[in-house]
Design a protein with these regions (language model features):
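Short, solvent-exposed beta-strand/turn "edge" segments of beta-rich domains on protein surfaces
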Residues: 10-19, 30-32
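A short, amphipathic edge element
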Residues: 1-10
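Acidic, low-complexity intrinsically disordered segments
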Residues: 35-87
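Hydrophobic beta-strand positions in extracellular immunoglobulin-like domains
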Residues: 26-28, 43
Length: 87
């Protein structure tokens, strides 16, 4: 299982400056077959400076959620660090 990309990412308007909400389509390689899932995710910056990433799956997934969520959080953190998220 590997996250290939998150396509069609759109940032939603939120009046809270330390919270960013996004929607998109996660493309994940499950058993050597790319599969698309619609997701909503948020990145919240805590007062300590730590990032908290939350993910909501809009489509149902026929795969254990814990490893998928862990991989997606790592991928989102990586693209956020590289400045790859839309403004």
């Amino acid at each position: 299982m590997k996250v290939i990309t998150i396509k069609d990412m759109i940032r939603k308007d939120v009046p809270i400056y330390y919270r960013m909400l996004y929607t998109g389509v996660a493309v994940i390689d499950l058993n050597n077959k790319p599969t698309d899932f619609r997701i909503d995710f948020s990145i919240e910056i805590k007062p300590t400076g730590q990032k908290e990433i939350g993910i909501v799956f809009i489509d149902s997934i026929d795969y254990p959620l814990v490893p998928v969520t862990k991989e997606l959080k790592a991928y989102i953190d990586e693209i956020d660090s590289q400045g790859g998220l839309p403004d």
